[in-house]
Amino acid sequence: MQHCILILAWGKCILKAKFFLPLLPVRFVLGDPEDNAGTQTGDPARGR
């Protein structure tokens, strides 16, 4: 049973990596909202 859970978790990690990998350059340009929320005042993604 743990083996199936491990495979499911690993599959989710792979899917997340494949989904978010093309978005990495965008996150670097705009800044990571989780890391520095509110530190960039002129960020167009935040509507300012």
Curated annotation (Swiss-Prot):
It comes from the Viruses. Keywords: Early protein. This is Probable protein E5A.
